[in-house]
């Protein structure tokens, strides 16, 4: 069972083999101007992405839905969501960004005022600082608890969902709170409500998620089919991205502070975390030169894979130099630490400047 509230590392191939997700490589060549996350295999799987490709090529309306979980600090692994949203913005999407304050309350015990504060200071400011203009007309940011359209739709959708179904998907038990059990229905409504007549009617919707969120996607698609006659819903599409590895193993997570580089870290803190991170190097320089490194097991290389945008040629050069033993870990780590320090020096200034806009988006 995949646990959407856990933080265990998943075997991505199992998702493809056992849950009906298709390899993204099958559609990559059809994607107009694919992003580096697509080209590098970070986005590894999809459901029905052909619909999104068709909409982009024909210039037809489509929407993107991806939420913020305001229960902890925003870390560098979250940046890939912003990078995807910036790409979809360029491709003409209408973007919906629910702030999951109801889920944060029910699943993680975060009260609503804290959710609002975390959303503003960590996530909205972070998204703006990373280059996404959240005040554009085609981008909609909202709190779940304040969106009556989402809440009303969720109530209707819940009429065709029962406890046994939720138990089978999420492992709910008799001790699970009603609020926690209702949270997935709110999320289903987040994903489906862009297709309501009030917002333009049925259209393709893409939901970029990590593999641990696939239970939500499967439930959403099942419920969309049940309400097709009433609303005309098109089954939402989804893409699946690999988790950035944590500094201590597993996936990077806000709930495990030692695993993450946070966007609110100072440049010095971010640099120090990179310098102390595990590499894929051998035990001695002699072995490194003779056997080469293992970039697939290196958080330093992974940092570049996820965050060094632009051409892939420089990244390929680093990979090959590591594998053939001509690039030593010390040099690579030093270069990456400098890259991260510069990135965070610029980001810290942008985050501070973004706070007034972040407050304005939620508080008016």
UniProtKB/Swiss-Prot annotation:
Pfam families for this protein: tRNA-synt_1b
Protein biosynthesis in keyword set: yes
EC number per UniProt: 6.1.1.2
Catalytic activity: tRNA(Trp) + L-tryptophan + ATP = L-tryptophyl-tRNA(Trp) + AMP + diphosphate + H(+)
Sequence motif 'HIGH' region, location on chain: 70-78
The keyword Metal-binding belongs to this UniProt entry's keyword annotation: no
Listed GO biological process terms: tryptophanyl-tRNA aminoacylation
Main location: cytoplasm
CC terms in the record's Gene Ontology section: cytoplasm
Protein name per its UniProtKB record: Tryptophan--tRNA ligase
Signal peptide from the UniProt entry: none
Motif ('KMSKS' region): 251-255
Subcellular location: Cytoplasm
Family: Belongs to the class-I aminoacyl-tRNA synthetase family.
UniProt-recorded Gene Ontology molecular function terms: ATP binding; tryptophan-tRNA ligase activity
Group of enzyme by EC: ligase
Keywords, in A-Z order: Aminoacyl-tRNA synthetase, ATP-binding, Cytoplasm, Ligase, Nucleotide-binding, Protein biosynthesis
């Amino acid at each position: 069972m995949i646990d959407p509230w856990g933080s265990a590392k998943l075997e991505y191939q199992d998702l493809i083999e056992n849950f009906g997700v298709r390899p993204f490589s099958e559609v990559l060549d059809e994607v107009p101007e694919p992003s580096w996350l697509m080209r590098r295999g970070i986005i590894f799987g999809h459901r029905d992405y052909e619909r999104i490709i068709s909409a982009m090529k024909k210039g037809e309306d489509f929407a993107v839905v991806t939420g913020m979980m305001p229960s902890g600090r925003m870390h560098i692994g979250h940046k890939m969501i912003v990078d995807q949203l910036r790409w979809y913005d360029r491709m003409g999407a209408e973007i919906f960004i629910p702030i999951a304050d109801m889920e944060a309350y029910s699943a993680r015990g975060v009260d609503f005022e804290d959710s609002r504060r975390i959303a503003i200071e960590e996530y909205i400011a972070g998204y703006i600082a990373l280059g996404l203009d959240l005040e554009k007309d085609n981008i909609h940011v909202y709190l779940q608890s304040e969106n009556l359209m989402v809440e009303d739709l969720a109530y209707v959708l819940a009429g065709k969902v029962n406890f046994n179904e939720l138990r089978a998907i999420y492992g709910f038990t008799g001790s699970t709170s009603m609020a926690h059990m209702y949270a997935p229905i709110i999320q289903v409504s987040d994903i489906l409500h862009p297709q309501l007549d009030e917002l333009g009617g049925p259209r393709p919707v893409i939901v970029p998620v990590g593999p641990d969120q696939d239970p939500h996607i499967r439930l959403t698609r099942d419920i969309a089919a049940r309400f097709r006659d009433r609303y005309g819903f098109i089954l939402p599409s989804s893409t699946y991205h690999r988790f950035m590895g944590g500094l201590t193993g597993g996936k990077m997570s806000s709930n495990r502070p030692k695993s993450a580089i946070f966007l609110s870290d100072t440049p010095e803190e971010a640099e120090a975390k990179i310098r102390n991170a595990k590499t894929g190097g051998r035990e001695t320089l002699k072995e490194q030169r003779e056997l080469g490194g293992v970039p697939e097991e290196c958080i330093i290389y992974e940092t570049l894979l996820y965050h060094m945008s632009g051409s892939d040629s420089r990244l390929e050069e680093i990979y090959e130099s590591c594998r053939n033993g001509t690039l030593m870990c010390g040099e690579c780590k030093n270069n990456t630490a400098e890259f991260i320090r510069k990135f965070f020096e610029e980001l810290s200034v942008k985050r501070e400047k973004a706070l007034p806009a972040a407050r304005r988006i939620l508080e008016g």
